[in-house]
Design a protein with these regions (language model features):
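Long amphipathic alpha-helical scaffold segments
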Residues: 102, 107-140, 144-146
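Short, Lys/Arg-rich N-terminal segment immediately upstream of the first membrane anchor
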Residues: 1-6
Length: 496
């Protein structure tokens, strides 16, 4: 009995220690859970997809908004192989004008400036200027479709739901300049004002918080139908809240896969009713070359121009992943397999001006190529490097939302895993990038040589009666004879 009494103080002290420990642990867990919220405004608004503007969502998360908008006012930064200085790639890499001969990218292609500017630059590119295209031999190019807005405008989900009545095909098949006229006004912006045409909640608004976050709890989600459709085809399951069933680590890459991918506009083989413009019936409205305007290349309805209903060939933004199954590492041959399978309905992006090869322009398949890299193999996500954790206000851990090159903050982006010095890492990165760039330039120059060889061969064959019709070179006969080298041009340039 005396022995039990002696144990009582010890038990009491032990219980106190356990209780204090549990309280501390609970506080620490709560702190960890709140680490990524940053500074939260006391003037909270109810977030909704009806107002996806970052200025509105930023009312609740001002620290993140400040990070995101930093790129709007800072001096553009150049890196050896990237950055956000919008230089002309055609001037720096003139071989691209030959590789893309016959395609609008041969006229205008600039380094990207980032998520804030992505819609501004898309609307301002010469590839979206019909008079410019007409004047440079691209009169047959009918202008960009709204499908291009999928990865440039934060208004895309709203426009699919409201302007296209939930019809993804109708959205994609509408003209770009027609669809942009339907962007609504929010945050007190006046219809048709300069702000309504601008990047802050207007028609030039780029990527927004809503593109990656659920308004209910700010968890990660994907909202672009093309990615959801492609992932389901690969073996993923749809999810009402996230778009796709995946854990948070994978979602930190999938949100980027909404746009940083290869894609094409797949014909549906059917006509679809879409929004048109009454300007098409106004015989006084012509392009500079005298042809009839079918849309007004302006972001607002004006001068009596109004919406009509027209019928066009349907297209869908599609990711060519049918041969790439869930859990597999991507291989470039998977693109070959997909494009070969759809060739009866989608032959090419364009016919090369010099070789007449049926070409595919590979866009920006970062997600696909990343899947086979050392970082993906070790469980690293896109956000780990391009949106690293940093110390925010009050020393809290937050995600960097000034999405940029890891080179600008190696300490946060790289040294979490890599223990070497910043100087060593910078040199290592530079060596790898230079090696890849050397191989890429070598492949491009070799392809240019092939183009010149095929062009010369076409000219020589065209002199022979067997490859002529009515005494003139017959391109169809020549292309049939050169089917193998033309196919090698197509596939080789896809890889270079």
């Amino acid at each position: 009995m005396q022995k039990n009494k002696g144990m009582l103080p010890i038990l009491i002290v032990g219980a106190v220690i356990i209780i204090v420990g549990l309280l501390w642990l609970n506080q620490d867990i709560s702190s960890k859970q709140a680490e990524n919220t940053g500074v939260i405004s006391k003037q909270l608004v109810e977030l909704t997809d009806e107002n996806p503007t970052f200025d509105f969502w930023g009312k609740n998360f001002p620290e993140y908004l400040d990070m995101y908008l930093k790129v709007e006012h800072e001096t553009p930064k150049y890196t050896n192989f990237g950055g956000n200085l919008a230089y002309s790639k055609l001037i720096r890499y003139p071989q691209l004008t030959i590789l893309w001969a016959g395609y609008p990218f041969s006229l205008d292609a600039n380094e990207e400036r980032g998520h804030f500017w992505i819609q501004v630059d898309q609307m301002d590119t010469a590839r979206n200027n019909k008079d410019f295209l007409n004047a440079h031999g691209f009169a047959k190019f009918g202008g960009q479709p709204a499908a291009c807005m999928n990865c440039h405008s934060g208004w895309t989900p709203w426009l699919i739901k409201n302007a296209a009545n939930g019809d993804f095909t109708a959205f994609n098949s509408t003209k770009y300049w027609t669809m942009i006229k339907n962007v609504p006004t929010r945050n007190g912006i006046e219809e048709g004002s300069e702000e309504h045409g601008g990047p802050h909640g207007g028609k030039r608004m780029g990527v927004t918080c809503a593109d990656c976050h659920n308004p209910d709890d700010m968890s990660l989600r994907v909202v672009r139908p093309a990615l959801i459709n492609a992932l389901v085809d690969r073996g993923y399951q749809k999810d009402a809240a996230q778009g796709i069933k995946a854990d948070r680590k994978e979602m930190r890459t999938l949100v980027c896969a909404q746009c940083h991918v290869e894609y094409y506009f797949k014909p549906t083989g059917e006509k679809v009713k879409v929004m048109g413009e009454s300007i098409a019936s106004d015989s006084s409205k012509k392009w500079w070359n005298g042809t009839q305007k079918t849309y007004d290349e302006f972001e607002h309805w004006r001068d009596g121009n109004k919406a009509t209903e027209i019928e066009v060939d349907g297209i869908n933004l599609t990711f060519p992943w049918s041969a790439w199954k869930k859990g597999e590492v991507f291989r470039i041959e998977m693109f070959d397999e997909h494009y070969d399978a759809v060739r009866p309905i989608f032959k090419e992006d364009w016919t090369h001006k010099e070789t007449k090869a049926p070409m595919l322009k590979i866009q920006h398949p970062e997600y696909e190529m990343f899947s086979g890299g050392v970082h993906a193999a070790n469980g690293v996500s896109c956000a780990d490097c391009h949106m690293p954790y940093i110390k925010g206000a009050g020393g809290k851990k937050v995600t960097q939302h000034n999405v940029t090159s890891p080179l600008f903050d190696i300490n946060s982006a790289c040294k979490t895993c890599h223990t070497q010095s910043e100087e060593y890492l910078k040199k290592q990165i530079a060596d790898i990038q230079k090696s890849v760039a050397f191989d890429l330039r070598s492949a491009e120059y070799a392809t240019v040589s092939l183009i010149f060889d095929i062009k010369k061969l076409r000219e020589e064959l065209g002199k022979l009666p067997a490859y002529q019709s009515e005494g003139k070179p017959d391109d169809a006969k020549i292309s049939k004879a050169l089917a193998e080298p033309l196919e090698l041009h197509r596939r080789g340039q896809m890889r270079g």
